[in-house]
């Protein structure tokens, strides 16, 4: 797979915008956060769905860039914005929008951070892992 293929580059571009937006959640109100998130998430989904999942190339472990502190900071910021609208029941258990979005953020941030290394085998494997997680978890 060419890591510079149009659909891949567009997915990474939208991923960068999504992460930048979510990282500034603590600066936003409900009325400025939710309408943008409602547009970004479907756009991110569409771009992820358009990427052809590559075969893994590298044998090295991919970098992890989102720490537990980062994750929790993002989750809490979104939970504070959403307040009582955060929790929902997914048919099996109670969960929250903020936790689901933080999960997606972690996956996308790790992917784009690995992609930014410029090492094509790392870039390829970062896309492969992210698209696999999209197909298995957050995109289903």
Q: What are these regions, as identified by a protein language model?
A:
Residues 50-116:
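Long amphipathic alpha-helical segments
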